[in-house]
């Protein structure tokens, strides 16, 4: 397949909001693709490189290269060139990358150059890999859409299913089954602003503790246990406690969904950072298990004794879970009948927060398990933390944000009145906010650098974040998890900003 064709479809998909039109465009593309093209076509449509990062920055891409007159590049040719680029290292690597990028761009037409620059800077975003892609693939291969959807769910990958369908036709779907030892992507939750909102949407529901641990999918086949993360990485050897817990259960063949969490001496959850350290690739497992022991807590069951339970309602899966897993290893939950029980749900949330957990997940009782999707029947509710911080510096953006000051350096007040940096963020900014922010920060600039500007610490910004973790990278000794801009607070002075001490007091146990 020519890159020009893929670039054209990507552009047309991005230009329409109609799912039906996206489906038609993607069906046409899949009909033209060969099975061998799929490992490149699918990631490129998603704006992702199969190679991951390849060390090519905006400075190299900004160099003007005369485009080719006619399209000749195939997607597989581009993939091979980018693989060579990613392998460049050592002395002279920057010059070699520049040369290889120049060769690639010189072989590309103007439209292809635009697509490649967007791909390499992360600016290809058209939401192609959603229901429209599944329906397009089904239409292209004369396969039932529901069967393709289920195969993608079980395979955890549209790419895997597309390769099979394009190579072998609809009969290939029979090979995609829920199987012990083959992980599936977990079901995820949407967010709700409150318990009342969640219960109002779902009606009869289970309200469960939301644990801030390591999401684990545990597979047991007789005496063999495998443990997978939410991204399907095998971490069996790093969590022997979870293996031991699974082997102690009465069932012989099952798949469980849950969390591995670590509690301190007072029975409160340790920080996510500490718990997540248990699965580091360089972790000494025995030493880590003594320092940060983990426990398995399960909240769902996907398969028992060869029976696929994904399509059963939550109430029936809960019953199966209770038969298999003893209460101490099951997540705490309460049941509500509808909005009239909102008070009980809010009380459960309050008790959950008091125990140190991060919130609750409200789950519709009649809902099936939608592997690999954010199901509308699971709604997570957790308090949103916000801070008033001061902008200390800002970095120039890349790609679509070129020429705009984008990545903010954030600081909190210290005891002596200075500001300690505790993180960066470029999230939560609209185009209008970026434009305003750039002009305002230019006015406050005291020093210019190649990467951006240092500014007078006068501008207060309200930041939302999901949690706090220790960090040796920043002077404050801690950093924010998933920080994003809510709004600027020009009504506040720098001395009104939150302090490092206040932040640490709000998150006991995370002090550096």
Swiss-Prot record:
An example Pfam family from this entry, by short name, is: DNA_ligase_A_M
For this UniProt record, give its keywords in alphabetical order, as a comma-separated list. ATP-binding, Cell cycle, Cell division, DNA damage, DNA recombination, DNA repair, DNA replication, Ligase, Magnesium, Metal-binding, Nucleotide-binding
- Residues noted as binding ATP in the record, renumbered to the chain: 208, 215, 230, 259, 299, 374, 380
What intrachain disulfides are recorded? none
Residue numbers annotated as active site: 210
One record GO biological process: DNA biosynthetic process
Q: From which organism does this entry originate?
A: Streptomyces coelicolor (strain ATCC BAA-471 / A3(2) / M145)
Q: Which top class of enzyme applies to this chain?
A: ligase
Q: Which gene is transcribed and translated to give this protein? A: lig
The molecule here is called Probable DNA ligase
Functionally, this protein is described as follows:
DNA ligase that seals nicks in double-stranded DNA during DNA replication, DNA recombination and DNA repair.
PANTHER family for this protein: DNA LIGASE 1/3 FAMILY MEMBER (PTHR45674), DNA LIGASE-RELATED (PTHR45674:SF13)
Query: Per the UniProt record, which EC number(s) apply here?
Result: 6.5.1.1
Task: Tell me the protein family, please.
Answer: Belongs to the ATP-dependent DNA ligase family.
């Amino acid at each position: 397949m020519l890159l020009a064709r893929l670039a054209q479809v990507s552009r047309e998909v991005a230009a329409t909001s109609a799912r039906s039109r996206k489906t038609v465009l993607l069906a046409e593309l899949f009909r033209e693709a060969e099975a061998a093209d799929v490992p490149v076509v699918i990631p490129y449509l998603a704006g992702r490189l199969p190679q991951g990062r390849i060390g090519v920055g905006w400075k190299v891409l900004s160099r003007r290269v005369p485009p080719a007159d006619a399209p000749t590049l195939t997607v597989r040719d581009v993939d091979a060139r980018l693989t060579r680029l990613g392998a460049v290292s050592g002395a002279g690597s920057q010059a070699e990358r520049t040369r290889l990028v120049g060769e690639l761009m010189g072989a590309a037409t103007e439209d292809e150059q635009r697509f490649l620059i967007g791909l390499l800077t992360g600016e290809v975003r058209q939401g192609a890999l959603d229901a429209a892609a599944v329906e397009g693939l089904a239409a292209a291969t004369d396969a039932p859409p529901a069967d393709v959807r289920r195969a993608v769910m079980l395979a955890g990958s549209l790419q895997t299913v597309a390769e099979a369908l394009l190579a072998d036709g609809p009969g290939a779907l029979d090979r995609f089954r829920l199987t012990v030892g083959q992980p599936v992507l977990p079901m995820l939750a949407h967010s709700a602003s409150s318990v009342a909102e969640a219960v109002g949407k779902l009606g009869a529901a289970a309200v469960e503790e939301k644990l801030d641990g390591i999401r684990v999918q545990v597979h047991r086949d007789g005496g063999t246990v495998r443990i997978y993360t939410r991204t399907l990485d095998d971490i069996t050897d790093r969590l022997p406690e979870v293996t031991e817990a699974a082997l102690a259960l009465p069932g012989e063949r099952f798949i469980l969904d849950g969390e591995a969490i670590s509690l301190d001496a007072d029975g409160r959850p340790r920080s996510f950072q500490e718990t997540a350290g248990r699965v580091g690739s360089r972790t000494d497992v025995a030493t880590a298990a003594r320092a940060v022991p983990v426990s398995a807590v399960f909240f769902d069951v996907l398969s028992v004794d060869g029976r696929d339970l994904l399509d059963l309602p939550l109430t029936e899966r809960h019953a199966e879970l209770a038969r298999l897993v003893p209460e101490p290893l099951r997540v705490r939950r309460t049941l509500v009948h509808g909005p009239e029980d909102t008070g009980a749900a809010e009380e459960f949330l309050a008790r959950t927060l008091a125990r140190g957990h991060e919130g609750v997940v409200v789950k519709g009782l009649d809902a099936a398990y939608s592997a690999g999707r954010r199901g509308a029947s699971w709604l997570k509710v957790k308090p949103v933390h916000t801070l008033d911080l001061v902008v200390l510096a800002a970095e120039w953006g890349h790609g679509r944000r070129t020429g705009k000051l984008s990545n903010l350096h954030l600081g909190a007040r210290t005891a002596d009145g200075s500001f300690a940096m505790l993180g960066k963020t470029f999230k939560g900014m609209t185009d209008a906010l970026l434009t305003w922010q750039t002009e305002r920060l230019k006015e406050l600039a005291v020093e210019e650098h190649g990467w951006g500007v240092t500014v007078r610490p006068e501008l207060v910004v309200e930041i939302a974040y999901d949690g706090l973790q220790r960090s040796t990278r920043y002077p404050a000794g801690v950093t924010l998890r998933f920080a994003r801009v809510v709004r600027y607070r020009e009504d506040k002075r720098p001395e009104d900003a939150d302090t490092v001490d206040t932040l640490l007091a709000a998150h006991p146990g995370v002090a550096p």
